[in-house]
Amino acid sequence: PEKDMLKDLYQTDDFFFYKSDAIKRMRLVKIEFRKVYRQDDEHFLHILENVRLNKVTPENIMHLNDRVHIPTAEDGAVITLASINKTADKINLQRLEEIESEEFVYEGTIDGKFEEKKFPVDMKLRLKVGAQVMFTRNDQQKRWANGTLGKVSKLTKDEISVTLNNGETYIVPCCSWESYSYDYNKEERKMKKELIGTFTQYPLKLAWAITVHKSQGMT
């Protein structure tokens, strides 16, 4: 639908932003950034530049590895950053298996249509008391936010309690996410939005490891 709308508006099959009407009407000034403001360590800047240009040397790797810190229990809740979901999932399941307590599985529900690739959390949420978890949705009462970390403190068939890093413990309610379809109305030249389904599940996921993509969204 979005493609049909853009094709109708711009009368072209090229949908690059610089071909938009807004850009064409602007007196666009091009600026190239050359000075780094976030770092003042010249040696570190040189390493970062080599990484960016794919020219990393063995010395660069050694310098970075020298600063690797292996987390200990004293570090508290720490997270492993993974490049892909598959790696993060593997680490999380390994850590979950290490906990010697009863496992509970909470299964989400779908009403209508909701694509699996759009699930905000797992359809089958596997948890144990002591598991490190992350909230995936803001709380309306502002007790936690998307990305808040905690540990599972109590589990029953119908109830999950999580203790946040600040020491506060809450019973976590289920949440529903909505899925929409979009259709372009050529006569009105507008996109029409229609609710097609909902997905209901606890807003939690195992969080010993998360993807870099997810971590960037938390900052």
Model-identified regions with their sequence ranges:
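Conserved ATP-binding/catalytic motifs of P-loop helicase motor domains
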Residues: 1-219
